[in-house]
Amino acid sequence: MTTFTHINSQGEANMVDVSAKAETVREAHAEAIVTMSKETLAMIVEGKHHKGDVFATARIAGIQAAKRTWELIPLCHPLLLSKVEVNLEPLLETNQVRIQSLCKLTGKTGVEMEALTAASVAALTIYDMCKAVQKDIVIEQVRLLEKCGGKSGHFIAEEK
């Protein structure tokens, strides 16, 4: 059975020691879905939001968040990310925005948390910019889509 790597033999939370691990290329993809009204989504897509370009702001927020994950999540290592992408896709038929993030590096630990943080903060930024026009926006399905590299190997999430 797999054990929790962040818990020591006394049951205390600890940062994992990665000093003896080999450096490998690691990559992770994550997503979040933001559901809103048809009117709010149209305002964003048509560039009519009074706060400016919602997608550009959310993209930059997601990239910044990935780079600062280690400051937000207590046991994450500071990482030298080599690539961060945040893509936002309006899904007009369902009144949603699909946010997909990619983080990559050559290092001793994975980038799943960075990818998840990027997608989450991009979604939160959309909410923040749109809350004046709609309070009941829903952020959902924040999940890891894929990861590769490292000891645990390749993971691909099942389709939803």
UniProtKB/Swiss-Prot annotation:
It comes from the Bacteria. Substrate binds at residues 75-77, 113-114. The active site is at 128. GO terms for molecular function: cyclic pyranopterin monophosphate synthase activity. Pathway: Cofactor biosynthesis; molybdopterin biosynthesis. Keywords: Lyase, Molybdenum cofactor biosynthesis. GO terms for biological process: Mo-molybdopterin cofactor biosynthetic process. It catalyses: (8S)-3',8-cyclo-7,8-dihydroguanosine 5'-triphosphate = cyclic pyranopterin phosphate + diphosphate. The keyword Zinc-finger does not apply. Its EC number is 4.6.1.17. Homohexamer; trimer of dimers. Belongs to the MoaC family. HAMAP family: MoaC_B. Catalyzes the conversion of (8S)-3',8-cyclo-7,8-dihydroguanosine 5'-triphosphate to cyclic pyranopterin monophosphate (cPMP). This is Cyclic pyranopterin monophosphate synthase. It comes from Haemophilus influenzae (strain 86-028NP). The gene is moaC.
